[in-house]
Regions:
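An N-terminal structural lobe/cap that precedes and organizes the functional/catalytic core
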Residues: 18-54
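Domain-level signal for soluble alpha/beta catalytic cores
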Residues: 13, 45, 59-71, 95, ...
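Catalytic cores of alpha/beta
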Residues: 20-27, 138-140, 161-166, 246-248
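Active-site beta->alpha loop and helix N-cap motifs at the rims of alpha/beta catalytic domains
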Residues: 41-43, 48-139
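N- or domain-start disorder-to-order transition segments that initiate the globular core
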Residues: 1-22
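Acidic (Asp/Glu)-rich catalytic clusters
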Residues: 2, 27-30, 81-90, 115-122, ...
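Catalytic beta/alpha-barrel core
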Residues: 12, 124-133, 148-160
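Catalytic alpha/beta core domains of metabolic enzymes, predominantly
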Residues: 149-258
């Protein structure tokens, strides 16, 4: 989808029954060619879906984080397998798993957890999602030094984009030096779009100014900076493209960004 303009859609939702059903249909029909997840998505899926009921009973003696990791890494591996053909054909095919958000200010903890989760799943098309914080940048670089793909998340500002690019570049250079001729790890920078407008629109509307535009402007500027690097291993990923309420069409941000 949108391949003629070098855009692709990644599904921002995972749940076990969905992975075994509609998710595969979307891949096979070339609607999506990637996926992302986060702890909130998994919490909703695990708490509301019957697909996890027996597993939760089986692992009920596990601590909450242990139980979460068992269920989440299993789902991520299933999704990665479904996307493996895309990955093999150099058509994206990545799925992301986020580190514990409580580690946002702990670079070493983020790196160790990201490496551990990647090694549990053991799939080449998995990305470890790391928040774009001062500690996160260091962890991103360290993960890439080990050949681990990274999804930099919670990116709102141009300064964050530049920090992510530097972290990716540093990690990739170190990996290339250690393993010359080996394919480099991939990275995406997840630029959050609509949340700017949710914050600003009320004030802009009260001032008689046009609304729901700043997020698009900011994301477009960030995208251009990333594309100027001319690095096929690093791409922009537009996140938070959904709308709230019924004032805007559901696909408003997607169409504007295209």
């Amino acid at each position: 989808m949108y391949r003629d303009i070098k855009f692709s859609l990644w599904c921002d939702f995972l749940e076990r029954d969905f992975i075994n059903g509609e998710f595969l249909n979307l891949i096979e029909n070339s609607v999506i060619n990637g996926a992302t997840s986060n702890p909130s998505i998994f919490k909703s899926a695990i708490c509301s879906s019957c697909a996890y009921a027996l597993l939760k009973d089986e692992y009920k003696r596990k601590r909450p984080k242990e139980l979460y990791e068992i269920l989440a890494t299993t789902d991520i591996k299933m999704a990665a397998n479904k996307l493996l053909k895309n990955y093999a054909n150099d058509d994206d095919g990545f799925v992301s798993l986020e580190v514990d958000p409580n580690l946002y200010d702990d670079s070493e903890g983020t790196y160790k957890e990201g490496k551990r989760l990647f090694n549990i799943i053991k799939m080449p098309n998995v990305m470890i999602k790391v928040p774009a914080t001062d500690s996160g940048y260091e962890a991103m670089s360290d993960l890439m030094k080990k050949g681990i793909n990274v999804n930099a998340t919670l990116v709102f500002s141009i300064s964050q984009v530049k920090e992510c690019l530097e972290a990716f570049s540093e990690g990739s250079r170190a990996y290339a030096k250690r393993f010359p001729g080996t394919p480099l790890p991939k990275g995406v920078i997840s630029i959050f779009v609509s949340r700017f407008d949710r914050l600003l629109d009320k004030s802009l509307k009260n001032a008689g100014l046009e609304t729901s535009k700043f997020g698009i402007y900011n994301a477009t500027k960030a995208y251009k900076i990333i594309e100027q690097q001319d690095n096929k291993n690093i791409r922009a990923l537009f996140a938070s493209t959904g709308v709230k309420g019924d004032e805007l069409p559901a696909d408003y941000y997607i169409k504007e960004l295209l």
